[in-house]
Amino acid sequence: VGSEMCIRDSTGAALLDAIVLAVVSREDEGTYGYKITQDVRKAIDVSESTLYPVLRRLQKGEYLEVYDRQFDGRNRRYYKVTETGRTQLIMYRKEWKEYSGKINELFEGGILE
């Protein structure tokens, strides 16, 4: 429950967007919701009911495109990172590097100016 609470603030929402974009970007042809959930859960404890609104938000922002593909006689919805999404992911990676560096400095005894 602790990590669920943590990801609800604005930093957490951006972090969750970044993690989802990173997971989806690993597959050139895109990937489907259940697999995205499983892969994200390798990093943080998050429910499907939390992730699907993130996928919709990323789609609405044109960071992800969506298409259906047949699987075992039914349609499976796939998500794929757009060029806009790739640009956003690059920015998220840069911000994460700076942010995590500052946090590491704090953990190791304070930020040096």
Annotated model-derived regions:
Residues 1-7:
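Short, small-residue-biased leader/transition segments that mark boundaries at the very start
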Residues 2, 15, 76:
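Short coil/loop residues immediately preceding or within conserved phosphate-binding loops
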Residues 8-52:
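N-terminal helix-turn-helix DNA-binding core of bacterial DNA-binding proteins
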Residues 53, 57:
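Alpha-helical DNA-recognition elements
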Residues 61-75, 80:
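Beta-hairpin "wing" of winged helix-turn-helix
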Residues 90-113:
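Amphipathic alpha-helical dimerization/coiled-coil segments
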